[in-house]
A protein has these predicted regions:
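Substrate/ligand-engaging "lid" and interaction regions
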Residues: 1-490
Length: 490
């Protein structure tokens, strides 16, 4: 079978406008995919040059063998209907190894058409490394690479204001652009690059903070041959993802003319405040996971899709969102309802096998960040406890209860006589290992009194200790499914 190539998917030569640190599945099915659509539907007329952000491993040979073409396949549910959309992406024009060919990489700093820098270097990528050195080609860290690249660009264009760059980090950390800018400014001072450069960073460059949301499942191992047959060509860079996508870009400047993604029908929001959108994602999408997964696992399920096909569990999850979470959020209700509806469809995606136990990683800190604000907001607004969020605390506790510490820092628990293993902060695992012989009521009071776990004394929320303790006792006495049927059965 013929390999995907430029003859199969011809495209005009476009100027490189985007330098992208990272060539992984997410960026290819998200940013590069959107730029490809912008090239088709607007006058953006730009291409992407990929930069390998670390020394190890690369997909670059595969890119070159396919003339920088690859296929994105979006699969999932849209408005309750199964969809499968394929697109050959032609927006990538080059792939540069900054370690093996630094001169080629550095030439991009002198390219007049360059306007954007995109990065996905993982959460650990945006960290200040004070041992990094300007003399390295390239510097070790991503902030180091970016600082040196921007300095060389400023020097090449004599600090022209119109040759600054727009920085678009998509790393999954809060205020990623603010954090990246702090690192760059710190290195500029440490490396004594001068006040002129520091001023150019402030006036000519734009550091945006972004929020991204799309589940990218990557290369479909085990399905690739069948998909190639359907496509009619071989694609070793095939990338799969869900149809849902969201890119919220917080910027001090209006970027919609230079990067006209919303005008192309793409799910991109430009704003001067991304926090309400972050809150929506954390409270609804992530909060739904964290609130229902412990109970679903204890009902005998192993993946999200199977749990969502249980009417009792899916109805309970939806009531959590619509009745208890959404009333505590500030965005327009219609936006929140639509987002919650999309979340339900995403959880039912038949192409995604999301293991419940993987979601249970660090459940206590996740509950604090994702569910506790909704619970406290609901109590403040109504003066009552939210039934489903309150029960989620009891189901979380019962997931951990009775566990024994293993030698490798996990908690071994039992479900129907079979072991399962939980990973969490050592203090959390020690707490449950040491208190599981206590009565449910005593353990609950101690758990909810632990400010280190919650950053607050949840035991002072009226009725919370009593309600969680009573539910925990019921779960231990009757089993999760029986108790959920009694409380929330449909």
């Amino acid at each position: 079978m013929e390999r995907l190539n430029a003859a199969m998917a011809p495209a005009p030569v476009r100027p490189v406008k985007v330098l992208q640190f990272g060539e992984g599945n997410f960026l290819r099915a998200f940013v590069d995919y959107m730029i490809d659509i912008a090239n088709e539907k607007s006058d953006f007329n730009g291409s992407v040059a990929l930069v390998k952000p670390i020394q190890m491993g690369t997909l670059f040979p595969a890119f070159k063998e396919q003339d920088y073409r690859y296929t994105v396949m979006l699969r999932g549910l849209v408005d309750g209907q199964a969809v499968e959309q394929t697109r050959v992406v032609t927006s990538v024009a080059d792939a540069v190894d900054a370690y093996a060919d630094y001169a080629h990489y550095a030439d991009y700093a002198k390219l007049p058409s360059l306007r954007f820098i995109v990065s996905n270097t993982t959460e650990a990528g945006i960290v200040l490394d004070e041992t990094d050195e300007f003399s390295l080609c390239p510097p070790k860290s991503y902030p180091g690479k970016l600082t040196k690249f921007l300095f060389e660009r400023a020097e090449a264009f004599d600090y022209a204001q119109d040759k600054g760059l727009i920085i678009l980090p998509v790393e999954l950390i809060d205020d990623n652009g603010i954090m990246l800018k702090k690192c760059v400014k710190a290195l500029a001072k440490q490396w004594a690059l001068g006040e002129k450069f520091e001023q150019w960073l402030e006036t000519a460059c734009v550091f945006t903070s972004t929020l991204v949301d799309r589940i990218v499942t990557g290369y479909p191992r085990g399905e690739d041959q069948a998909i190639w047959e359907k496509l009619g060509y071989q694609d070793n860079l095939l990338d799969t993802a869900e149809p849902f996508g969201l890119w919220v870009i917080e910027s001090p400047r209006d970027l919609s003319d230079e990067l006209p993604l919303p005008q192309c029908g793409l799910p991109v929001i430009y704003t001067d405040n991304q926090k309400p959108y972050k809150q929506r994602k954390v409270r609804i999408l992530n909060g739904a996971h964290t609130s229902f997964v412990p109970a679903a696992f204890q009902c005998g399920y192993d993946i999200v899709l199977d749990a969502m096909n249980d009417p009792m569990i899916s109805t309970s999850m939806q009531k959590t969102l619509y009745d208890e979470v959404i009333p505590t959020l500030s965005l327009p209700k219609a936006d929140l309802m639509a987002f919650a509806e999309a979340v339900t469809g995403r959880f039912r995606n038949p192409f995604i096998k999301h293991a419940l136990l993987s979601i249970c990683l660090n459940s206590v800190s996740k509950w604090r960040a994702r569910c506790m604000p909704s619970l406290l907001g609901y109590v403040e607004k109504t003066g009552e406890l939210p039934a489903h969020l309150t029960f989620s605390l009891a189901s979380l506790m019962s997931l951990y209860r009775g566990g024994k510490l293993t030698g490798d820092g996990r908690l071994e628990c039992q479900r129907d006589g079979q072991p399962y293993y939980l990973q969490d902060d050592a203090a959390v695992l020690n707490f449950f290992a040491e208190t599981s012989s206590e009565s449910p009521e005593e353990q609950t009071k101690e758990f909810l009194s632990n400010e280190a776990f919650f950053g607050a004394e949840l035991c002072k929320v009226p009725g919370l200790v009593e309600s969680v303790g009573a539910s925990l006792r019921e779960i231990l006495d009757k089993g999760m499914r029986t108790v959920m049927n009694e409380k929330f059965g449909v």
